Amino acid sequence: MKKLYILFLILILLSFSTTGCSAEKYGAGIDKNIPLVKVKDVFLDNSLQGKMVTLEGVISTQCQSSGCWFFLSDGTGRVFINLAPKGFTLPPKTGKKAKVTGEVMRDQHNVQIIAHGVEIY
């Protein structure tokens, strides 16, 4: 009986170690069918204008008042992520890893991502 109890306890501990933490989702979440690109790509590849992309990086700066925007950095650059057009906000998450799915928008000199969904992990 003692061996059965120990085996049961080991199985429970193993199940906890394999489940991992789930991501916090905001907006529509991440669309797994949309390609993952680097931040530098949204600046250098003009064909991405108006297209949906997914980015992954760290939240380097964030709106202090309402959480309606942030900058995402991935080692290749930093891009402005705008949450306001889709009507959602993010609680303080500066320094956290994030994935963003959104539309690449650019004007003459600026590039931004209109976020449709964000996951923090």
Q: For the regions a protein language model found, what residue spans apply to each?
A:
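OB-fold and OB-like single-stranded nucleic-acid-recognition modules
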Residues: 20-121
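Positively charged n-region of N-terminal signal peptides that target proteins for export
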Residues: 1-4
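Bacterial N-terminal signal peptides
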Residues: 8-17
